[in-house]
Curated annotation (Swiss-Prot):
Cysteine disulfide links: none
Coiled-coil residues: none
HAMAP family assigned to the protein according to its UniProt record, in alphabetical order: Ribosomal_bL31_2
Family of the protein in this entry: Belongs to the bacterial ribosomal protein bL31 family. Type B subfamily.
Entry's Gene Ontology molecular function annotations: structural constituent of ribosome
Quaternary structure note: Part of the 50S ribosomal subunit.
Name of the molecule in the record: Large ribosomal subunit protein bL31B
UniProt keywords, alphabetically: Ribonucleoprotein, Ribosomal protein
Record-level GO cellular component terms: ribonucleoprotein complex; ribosome
PANTHER family cross-referenced by the UniProt entry: 50S RIBOSOMAL PROTEIN L31, CHLOROPLASTIC, LARGE RIBOSOMAL SUBUNIT PROTEIN BL31C
Keyword NADP: no
Gene Ontology biological process: translation
Gene that encodes it: rpmE2
Length: 88
């Protein structure tokens, strides 16, 4: 393998913010946040859904706020690239 071109493969702590579940796995993901967990400092990645909170794995129905996301997207980007705008 060529030296210096591969991403760093290290232990990372993933935090499921929907149910406060944390797990450590190895990853090459880049993150700016760090957290101390069980006496060791790890890079931190916050996620909204994991196997501990996903309805498929838990068997519980959960309402996901997709409407809020769509509204936020429309506010941010408006009608850029819409069909009516392209026809003009």
């Amino acid at each position: 393998m060529k030296a210096g071109i591969h991403p760093e493969y290290r232990e990372v702590l993933f935090h499921d913010v929907s149910n406060d579940f944390k797990f450590i796995t190895r990853s090459t993901i880049n993150t700016r946040e760090k957290i101390e967990f069980e006496g060791t400092e790890y890079p931190l990645v916050k996620i909204e859904v994991s196997s501990e909170s996903h309805p498929f794995y838990t068997g519980k129905h959960k309402i996901v706020d997709t409407a809020g996301r769509v509204d936020k997207f429309r506010k941010k980007f408006g009608t850029v690239g819409s069909k009516t705008q392209m026809a003009e």
